Amino acid sequence: MGGLGTPSGPVLACGEVRTRLLPTSHAVDERTAERLLRLRTDERVRLSRHPNRYAVSPGLLTGVDCRPPSVTGARSRVVGTVTARAVLVEGRVLQSSAHFSAPASGPDRRRPWGHYLGRPGCLIPVGRLPVRSVTEGFLAGPGPHELDVGSIAESLMARVCRHRILDFDLPLTTVNTSLRWTAVPAVEGEVTSVLFTKADDGLRTVALRLPHGTAPAAVAGLCEDLALHDWLLTTVAYALDGLPAGHEDSGLPEVLRSLVDHLLHLWMPRGHVDRTLHTVWEELDEHAGCSRQWNVMGQRIRDQLVLRAVRSRHQPSAGD
């Protein structure tokens, strides 16, 4: 299948990304990352060291035959497979994502499974797909008996987190986030656009309009990167929320050092994003000020550590 909006390609791609701190006390090494993400025996874990350590599991397919989410209640039906994978960044942050793409129409009757398995990660409608209704419905969340891609991502996350190699001793109190996304081809003459929305319950939604020919897998990679950096912002902001101005909190320096040791070096926007989609990240960063906020928080952490080091040197010793 081709890219978004091409004659042989899909008219819609949707997915969900879950992000959390790997439940272990220290960042794991490359060999351990490979063990964690070895979800299939017939395909190797992909490892990268540049621009940072990055491990990607083999893809897993989940067969579905159900109604897609719909804001209009349209009783459409899709059949095929959702593709999912797990990603580990610098041995420290774990992500699981699941996504699919869909063409505008399919056969009027359901075909045998062999027809669908030849197009992994594609859900083919029975008849026509109400694209706008499904796009809006996916972002709003699934109803009863509707496709729930988030549950596929969550199941994969739980599978990795149950691995016996993890010690479940977290160095930081962190939040878990979910990012739900849709992508459709931009109409002729329309510029690329991204609409990013945050909710208080850890859910983020991203609605994308992208150039014709954009590969759904590239969109999924972009949204994993957006989810990672949103999680970093959220987690560090949560740790700094209500930070006392004084030096009476003896446990505070340890919290600050943990942020430096485990998270501050992970900020690397677009590090694993397809080059054709770099401008989407840049547009979001320009409007939302993600990098500016990150730099301010990082400087605040370093200033607090320096201030506490200076104060500790000037405190009188017990014998004075």
What are these regions (language model features)?
Residues 55-81, 86, 210-212, 234-242, ...:
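Generic hydrophobic segment detector
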Residues 225-227, 231-320:
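Membrane-associated alpha-helical segments
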Residues 1-197:
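Short Lys/Arg-enriched alpha/beta "domain-start" segment
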Residues 182-234, 238-246:
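Extended, charged amphipathic alpha-helical segments
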